[in-house]
A protein has these predicted regions:
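TPR repeat positional signature
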Residues: 108-109, 113-116, 171, 210, ...
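Residue at a conserved register position within TPR or TPR-like alpha-solenoid repeats
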Residues: 116, 120-123, 178, 215, ...
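Charged, E/D/K/R/S-rich low-complexity terminal regions of large eukaryotic assembly subunits
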Residues: 1-107, 114-117, 128, 141-164, ...
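Amphipathic alpha-helical repeat scaffolds
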Residues: 172-176, 220, 259, 287
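Short coil/turn segments at helix-helix junctions and helix-capping linkers
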Residues: 96-104, 161-162, 178, 201-208, ...
Length: 410
């Protein structure tokens, strides 16, 4: 049966009295079926035509209900900018109620903040298409940050009913907004507050989905700052805690975890690449080149995928993977020399020429070998006078992951 506005108000009131957060979230969601039902009751709803409903239920819920109708109306008329403004006002009204209540309100908070972010995305996209400039996502991020403060400052609720149980979900949403508008540095303020807060539950006690989102963005922040050890740690935890059916989220994490593992010499299996064909298209050529020690193939893969790698912020990381490829090439030289401990530099020079570095001089080849020794990819030293590479009798080519701080020296 279609819902009229009086029934809508009654159901909101019932949800409030029962402290039913999930139902309240459902009632405030613009995509819920009753949104279209309510519009049938009003031809062209405006704040003034709906003003007489103020006082119908306790404040601020009378105004929130009116805002909801206005939001649905703007969405139906494909006006995302106006819908975003009304949703922002709805969130502000909700905050007045939220800060005076306990954690049962969190499902509704999460829902209206998600809708705010989605409408901000739609509004910015719509403006861009029409050659206009808007910063709705930036405004959304500021609003979400206010929600974070409202969650953190709950001092009165019992621990199991605290608004603090919303902290990591809200932080994850704020980080999504900041990453979307490329204002990543703003995430550091929130992380600093979390790190300095001793009165919130440990991360592992929060819902797993909250943990995964937070660790993913923490890993991404470390990745972009070239703090590769911490990035690998956080992304690994995010991946192994990610729901097995959340295939897209797993792929999103692996897009950055795989190159970090490659830099340590841990190449992805064929089975993993089969499960994620989009990632296989990006990484398989690099993996094949590293296994073959084929520098030319590695360079071709970089060139062909340059635009995509720049878009994903992966170009610099995979450029560093050349050293893994060079290690593979030099190891093949060592194998061709029957694993000898004394190999002329000329052999490494010849291998580089064959691999596509056609203009390289012997002196440059010597420098490349010296660099591989310095970074721990090879064990030995160079006799410059005799133009000879003297390799260790045992473990001349250690596994990349066995090098001291294998990511720190990249």
């Amino acid at each position: 049966m279609p819902m009229d506005f009086s029934t809508f108000l009654t159901q909101i009131n019932d949800a409030l009295n029962a402290e039913n957060g999930p139902n309240l979230a459902y009632l405030l969601r613009p995509t819920s079926p009753h949104g279209k039902d309510l519009l049938k009751s009003f031809r062209s709803p405006t704040a003034s035509t709906l003003a007489h409903f103020k006082g119908s239920i306790t404040s601020p819920w009378d105004e929130i209900a009116i805002q909801y109708v206005l939001i649905c109306s703007h969405i139906a008329r494909l006006r995302p900018g106006e819908a975003f403004k009304e949703q922002s006002q709805l969130v502000s009204l909700f905050f007045r109620f939220f800060i005076e209540n306990r954690g049962w309100t969190l499902p509704a908070l999460f829902s209206i903040l998600r809708d705010l972010r989605d409408l901000a995305h739609d509004a910015d996209w719509h403006a861009k298409v029409h050659n206009q400039n808007t910063e709705c996502m930036v405004e959304a991020a500021r609003t979400v940050a206010k929600a974070f403060s409202s969650c953190m400052t709950d001092r009165l609720s019992p621990p199991d009913e605290s608004r603090k149980w919303g902290v990591y979900y809200v932080v994850g949403l704020a980080m999504k907004c900041y990453f979307k508008v490329k204002r990543i540095s703003l995430t550091k303020n929130i992380i600093k507050v979390l790190d300095n807060s001793s009165d919130i539950p440990a991360l592992e006690f929060y819902p797993r989905s909250h943990q995964v989102t937070y660790r993913y963005y923490l890993g991404m922040l470390s990745f972009l700052n070239e703090e590769y050890e911490k990035a690998e740690q956080e992304l690994t935890l995010a991946f192994y805690h990610c729901h097995i059916q959340a295939h897209d989220n797993q792929a999103r994490i692996l897009a950055y975890l795989i190159p970090l593992r490659i830099l340590k010499g841990h190449l992805p299996s064929d089975e993993l690449m089969y499960r994620f064909p989009v990632l296989a298209d990006i990484f398989s050529p690099f993996v094949a080149a590293i296994r073959a020690g084929d520098l030319a193939a590695y360079e071709r893969a970089l060139e062909l995928r340059e635009a995509r790698l720049i878009e994903l912020n992966l170009l610099l990381t995979l450029e560093k993977g050349r050293e893994l490829c060079m290690r593979g090439l030099f190891r093949r030289v060592w194998l061709a020399a029957d694993k000898g401990t004394r190999i002329p530099i000329s052999m490494f020079h010849a291998a580089l020429l064959i691999s596509g570095m056609k203009d390289i001089e012997v002196e440059e080849a010597e420098c490349l070998v010296a660099n591989m020794v310095y970074k721990g990819f090879m064990r030995g030293y160079i006799s410059h006078e005799k133009q000879m590479v003297v390799l260790a009798a045992n473990n001349a080519f250690p596994r990349p992951a066995e090098r001291p701080a294998p990511l720190a020296s990249l």
